[in-house]
């Protein structure tokens, strides 16, 4: 993590998630790396109901959350029931299905069979309460600093 404060924040989410009933599939926690100073956290995997802070908020740490769903439609609906929308990954051997799902997810970024891939010039950014909006690292970024104004006066 970038700081002790962020490490404590991530560990707090793990604790709150468990207190709210999340099943621990892979236990995370603070990690010490011999000979390396830093604020390390072991990856964690939690599972259960989406009615859980660890599933509902952006943790910005090595934490994943699994929630079961019956079919594609329910999975999309569940994924979109959030106040956030920074990014998602869709993983499937059926690329057509993965593309169909990714196009229906409300987020600034959707990746298929990968994560955190940013080719140059591709806009990224979040929606809803995530990030600063779309368009970072692209021509769309300029629109964040641009105020369009038309002034019309008689001659």
Residue positions per predicted region:
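Generic structural motif recognizing short loop/turn segments at the entrances and edges of beta-strands
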Residues: 20-21, 37
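Low-complexity, intrinsically disordered short peptide segments enriched in small/polar/basic residues
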Residues: 7, 21-22, 60, 73
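Conformationally flexible catalytic loops at phosphate/diphosphate-handling active centers
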Residues: 14
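Conserved C-terminal structural/oligomerization subdomain of aldehyde/semialdehyde dehydrogenase
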Residues: 33, 37-155
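Short beta-strand to alpha-helix junction loop
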Residues: 1-11
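Short secondary-structure junctions
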Residues: 21-31
């Amino acid at each position: 993590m970038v700081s002790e404060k962020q490490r404590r924040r991530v560990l707090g989410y793990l604790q709150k998630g468990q207190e709210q009933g999340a099943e621990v599939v892979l236990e995370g926690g603070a990690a010490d790396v011999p000979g390396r100073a830093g604020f390390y956290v072991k990856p964690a995997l939690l599972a259960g109901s989406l009615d859980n802070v660890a599933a509902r908020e952006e943790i910005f740490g090595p934490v994943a959350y699994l929630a079961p769903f019956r079919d594609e439609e329910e999975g999309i609906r569940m994924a979109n029931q959030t106040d956030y929308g920074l990014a998602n990954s869709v993983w499937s051997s059926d690329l057509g299905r993965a593309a169909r799902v990714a196009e229906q997810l409300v987020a600034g970024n959707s990746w298929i069979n990968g994560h955190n891939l940013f080719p140059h010039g591709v806009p990224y950014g979040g929606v809803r309460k995530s990030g600063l909006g779309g368009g970072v690292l692209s021509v769309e970024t300029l629109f964040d600093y641009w105020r369009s104004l038309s002034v019309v006066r008689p001659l």
